[in-house]
């Protein structure tokens, strides 16, 4: 076994590649001196042998063997021939995984403009050439000629566009016997673009732009600054403008655009293979037409088709008709693979599935405390499995990991007791996408619950921007003691009451909570069932309400010896009754107090409703805990 290679990356940078660099990516020299890497045939695999065709899109000589330690012709098999290059087929005997990173290239018979830099917003080619995008497109797609050098012609200017008729007229003048015209050069297509870009002296251009900017104003100044910024970036990165026109295009490794055989013997293939095949076919046809000196109009048409094929490969649908495959589905180009939510960056590089994490729908947990969340049992046993196994072995209930896993899979009752011990004091982190601010991920103490949904305290919903209409949340388990301590001290929901953006409380009662509190404490003169009854304690009132002896809003007297506050002053007696033993009963608006002869309070009954009793008791219990 070879040690695993670990490549450390600081960052990934996207830039322009020179034709030489693209060749370096794909070119390799075999021990016999043969240089391989250029893909020249559109074939993929042989339909009889099911082996890759040589010099095709899946060529084993270019990309490496299709089977581990086996060459194309079968002369060398087994790992003992490692590193040998077969004399017959030229395939290096190595692992097949090299087909995931070895690249090839296609040498184009005519230059082709890169569609990103031509049709992107902004169009860097048109900015650099200081020409309207419409004019640049006319040149690239063979609709107009462009003057590359006006020579001594007074009627022509550099970068002037000419129609077919205008060019024929000038051509007649050039080739007439008494012609005075000299040094007139006109081009069309990406070749003309390549020449125009190569003629730009970036340093000189930047210098003259800086001088112009000093005196320019308004729209013109903004345009000059935009152009200068692009030129400065080219100078800073060491890229050349002519690299925006490609003479060589890379062929990505075959295992990244696979071709697999289905059950019925048919093949399913990546769209990229179809797009590459179109490019190779048109490129080969163009090379053949140039060889046989075909008429200019035919060659030009083929060049335009090659440009369109490369456009479709890089960014299908950016310009012109979208290339479609079977059942009129647009083919996925290189741009489609890397951009968007399902693209390589967001799907595979930035967002990865991690261990010790789960995901489920959230439901409201009204009985939870603010720092708690309800974690489904089957999710908790999976997330905390290593901790549970460790605890089972340490307690002597099982001897090894295999036995512990068997015990867990049988849902043994003892496992749940161990799980309860493990999760006690072990916070978990809940995250709801999109995490737009730091309160989008918070820590909670898990409480085991039945069912498959995560229970969430309603007060923390505004921080997560969560509601219970089908939202999902991810659970992450902090493993190390440091991360657990950090989660508990910094991320616990009860420590995140204020919004980091505004400094105002983000945990505020709303909706059901406000409505419920209002309904419990509201007055309803129509509620008369059980009104005026006396009760010895708060619990008796709640019990009577639960047994439907009294209405929620009926006013009753309940014994309560603590302090009483009301929204209106309640110090003036309404009625005072003196008893035979000298004690007296004082009736206030909201309470009834019995005092002895010395004025000491014997008992106090408050005039309230069962709803207010329930509300008051809930707050008292919350404060006491």
Swiss-Prot record:
GO biological process: DNA-templated transcription
Gene (name only): rpoC1
Its biological purpose: DNA-dependent RNA polymerase catalyzes the transcription of DNA into RNA using the four ribonucleoside triphosphates as substrates.
NCBIfam families according to UniProt: PRK02625.1, rpoC1_cyan
GO molecular function: DNA binding; DNA-directed RNA polymerase activity; magnesium ion binding; zinc ion binding
EC numbers, comma separated: 2.7.7.6
Origin species: Nostoc sp. (strain PCC 7120 / SAG 25.82 / UTEX 2576)
Self-association state and partner proteins as the record states: In cyanobacteria the RNAP catalytic core is composed of 2 alpha, 1 beta, 1 beta', 1 gamma and 1 omega subunit. When a sigma factor is associated with the core the holoenzyme is formed, which can initiate transcription.
Catalytic activity: RNA(n) + a ribonucleoside 5'-triphosphate = RNA(n+1) + diphosphate
Name of this chain's protein: DNA-directed RNA polymerase subunit gamma
Cofactor binding, per record: Binds 1 Mg(2+) ion per subunit.
Stated family: Belongs to the RNA polymerase beta' chain family. RpoC1 subfamily.
HAMAP family, per the entry: RNApol_bact_RpoC1 (MF_01323)
Binding site for Mg(2+): 467, 469, 471
Uppermost EC category: transferase
Keyword vocabulary terms for this entry: DNA-directed RNA polymerase, Magnesium, Metal-binding, Nucleotidyltransferase, Transcription, Transferase, Zinc
Annotated positions binding Zn(2+): 71, 73, 86, 89
PANTHER family: DNA-DIRECTED RNA POLYMERASE, DNA-DIRECTED RNA POLYMERASE SUBUNIT BETA
SMART domains according to UniProt: RPOLA_N
Cofactor(s) the protein needs: Mg(2+); Zn(2+)
GO (cellular component) term, any one: DNA-directed RNA polymerase complex
Domain of life: Bacteria
Lineage, highest ranks first: Bacteria, Bacillati, Cyanobacteriota, Cyanophyceae, Nostocales
């Amino acid at each position: 076994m070879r040690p695993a290679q670990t490549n450390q990356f600081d960052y990934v940078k996207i830039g322009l590649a020179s034709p030489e660099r693209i060749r370096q990516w794909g070119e390799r020299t075999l021990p016999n001196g043969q240089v391989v890497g250029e893909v020249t045939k559109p074939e993929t695999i042989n339909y009889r042998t099911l082996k890759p065709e040589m010099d095709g899109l899946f060529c084993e000589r270019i990309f490496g063997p299709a089977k581990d330690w086996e060459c194309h012709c079968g002369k060398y098999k087994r790992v003992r021939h490692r590193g040998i290059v077969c004399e017959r087929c030229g395939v290096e005997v190595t692992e097949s995984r090299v087909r995931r990173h070895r690249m090839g290239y296609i040498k184009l018979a005519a230059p082709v403009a890169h569609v990103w830099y031509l049709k992107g917003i902004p169009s860097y080619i048109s900015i650099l050439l200081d020409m309207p995008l419409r004019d640049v497109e006319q040149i690239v797609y063979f609709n107009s000629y462009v003057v590359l050098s006006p020579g001594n012609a007074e009627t022509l200017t550099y970068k002037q566009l000419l129609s077919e008729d205008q060019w024929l007229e000038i051509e007649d003048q050039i080739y007439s016997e008494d012609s005075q015209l000299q040094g007139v050069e006109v081009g069309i297509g990406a070749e003309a673009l390549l020449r125009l870009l190569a003629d730009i002296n970036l340093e000189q251009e930047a210098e003259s732009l800086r001088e112009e900017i000093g005196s320019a104003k308004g729209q013109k100044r903004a345009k000059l600054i935009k152009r200068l910024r692009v030129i400065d970036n080219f100078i800073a990165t060491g890229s050349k403008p002519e690299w925006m026109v490609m003479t060589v295009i890379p062929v990505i490794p075959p295992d990244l655009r696979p071709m697999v055989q289905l059950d019925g013997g048919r093949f399913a293939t990546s769209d990229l293979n179809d797009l590459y095949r179109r490019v190779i076919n048109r490129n080969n046809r163009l090379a053949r037409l140039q060889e046989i000196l075909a008429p200019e109009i035919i060659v030009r048409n083929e060049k335009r088709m090659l440009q369109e094929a490369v456009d479709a490969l890089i960014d299908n649908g950016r310009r012109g008709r979208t290339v479609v495959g079977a059942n009129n589905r647009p083919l996925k180009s290189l741009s489609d693979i890397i951009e968007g939510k399902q693209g390589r960056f967001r799907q595979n590089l930035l967002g990865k599935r991690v261990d010790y994490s789960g995901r489920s729908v959230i439901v409201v947990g009204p009985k939870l405390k603010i720092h708690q969340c309800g974690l489904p049992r089957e999710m908790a046993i999976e997330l905390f499995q290593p901790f549970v196994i460790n605890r089972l072995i340490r307690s002597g209930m099982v001897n090894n990991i295999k036995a512990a896993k068997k015990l867990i899979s049988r849902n043994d009752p003892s496992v749940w007791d161990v799980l309860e011990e493990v999760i006690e004091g072990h916070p978990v982190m809940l995250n709801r996408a999109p995490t737009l601010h730091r309160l989008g991920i918070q820590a909670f103490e898990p409480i085991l619950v039945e069912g498959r949904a995560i229970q969430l305290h309603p007060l923390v919903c505004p921080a997560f921007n969560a509601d219970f209409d089908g939202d999902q949340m991810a659970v992450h388990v902090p493993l190390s003691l440091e991360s657990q301590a950090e989660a508990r001290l910094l991320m616990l929901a009860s420590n995140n009451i204020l919004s980091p953006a505004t400094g105002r409380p983000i945990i505020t009662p709303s909706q059901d909570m406000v409505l419920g509190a209002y309904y419990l404490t509201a007055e309803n003169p129509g509620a008369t069932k059980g009104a005026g009854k006396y009760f010895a304690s708060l619990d008796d009132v709640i019990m009577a309400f639960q047994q439907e002896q009294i209405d929620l809003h009926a006013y009753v007297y309940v014994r309560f010896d603590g302090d009483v506050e009301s929204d209106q002053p309640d110090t003036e007696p309404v009625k005072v009754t003196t008893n035979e033993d000298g004690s007296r009963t004082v009736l206030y608006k909201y309470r009834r107090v019995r005092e002895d002869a010395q004025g000491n309070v014997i008992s106090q009954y408050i005039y309230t409703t069962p709803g207010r009793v329930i509300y008051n008791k809930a707050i008292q219990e919350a404060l006491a805990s």
